[in-house]
């Protein structure tokens, strides 16, 4: 092959390779694009009910499940969780972001899971671009939203009597001014009604201001993720609550 032809062939191969890399890079970016954050809090008593595991004496207040970018996860697998970076936050983390379903000593595994799956994607935002910022901002939002106090002030507290799903929806919308998303555990064969399990409040990407979780025409995700580890088996998954009665279970064990 003549030198000119060889150079042309090499240039063509190089251009093709660059096009392929560019396409792959765009697909990667598209896979990790997200538009809003979701502050997810769960009711520990229900979490323990849906997971067949060694859940013991769960907290009797709503705790953090996570701060999730929508439609994006696992954005940077080369950015490992480092407990040292959040050591100043540990007292609050243990109280308000506990791993309620496992009794193993290394409870930081739950935080590791949340960072690697969700935090590495949230880091696209300057206010969340480190582990300390991500977990610290999550704790700030937990305090600011104050879901536990809001429900109590509205007269919604754990009870053996059933509520209506609309009681939760209307009360939260009235206080926060936005449409939340509420997930329930479907009834088992020996249960009459669904059980409330998780409440999502959605936030704008850049400044973390409240916004509707669903807009007209938008379909909510039917099933929510569950934190599993050490071979734990999920018995039932959370679903968006159906309109109708709902059980808000009181803690089974009285704490002293």
From Swiss-Prot:
Effect after changing residue 184 to R: In LCWM; the loss of a disulfide bond may affect protein folding and stability; the protein is retained in the endoplasmic reticulum and the mitochondria while lysosomal localization is disrupted
Single GO MF descriptor: ribonuclease T2 activity
Active site: 65, 114, 118
Top-level division of the source organism's lineage: Eukaryota
Positions annotated as glycosylated: 76, 106, 212
Expressed in which tissues: Ubiquitous. Higher expression levels observed in the temporal lobe and fetal brain.
Activity control note: Inhibited by Zn(2+) and Cu(2+).
Keywords: Disease variant, Disulfide bond, Endonuclease, Endoplasmic reticulum, Glycoprotein, Hydrolase, Immunity, Innate immunity, Lyase, Lysosome, Mitochondrion, Nuclease, Secreted, Signal
Enzyme class label: lyase
GO terms (BP aspect): innate immune response; RNA catabolic process
Record-listed E.C. numbers: 4.6.1.19
Presence of keyword Flavoprotein: no
Assigned GO CC terms: azurophil granule lumen; endoplasmic reticulum lumen; extracellular exosome; extracellular region; extracellular space; lysosomal lumen; lysosome; mitochondrial intermembrane space
Reactions it catalyzes: a ribonucleotidyl-ribonucleotide-RNA + H2O = a 3'-end 3'-phospho-ribonucleotide-RNA + a 5'-end dephospho-ribonucleoside-RNA + H(+); an adenylyl-uridine-RNA = a 3'-end 2',3'-cyclophospho-AMP-RNA + a 5'-end dephospho-uridine-RNA; a guanylyl-uridine-RNA = a 3'-end 2',3'-cyclophospho-GMP-RNA + a 5'-end dephospho-uridine-RNA
Disulfide bond positions: 48-55, 75-121, 184-241, 202-213
Function field: Ribonuclease that plays an essential role in innate immune response by recognizing and degrading RNAs from microbial pathogens that are subsequently sensed by TLR8. Cleaves preferentially single-stranded RNA molecules between purine and uridine residues, which critically contributes to the supply of catabolic uridine and the generation of purine-2',3'-cyclophosphate-terminated oligoribonucleotides. In turn, RNase T2 degradation products promote the RNA-dependent activation of TLR8.
Disorder association: Leukoencephalopathy, cystic, without megalencephaly: An infantile-onset syndrome of cerebral leukoencephalopathy. Affected newborns develop microcephaly and neurologic abnormalities including psychomotor impairment, seizures and sensorineural hearing impairment. The brain shows multifocal white matter lesions, anterior temporal lobe subcortical cysts, pericystic abnormal myelination, ventriculomegaly and intracranial calcifications.
Family that this chain belongs to: Belongs to the RNase T2 family.
PANTHER family documented for this protein: RIBONUCLEASE T2 (PTHR11240:SF22)
Annotated protein name in UniProt: Ribonuclease T2
Native organism: Homo sapiens
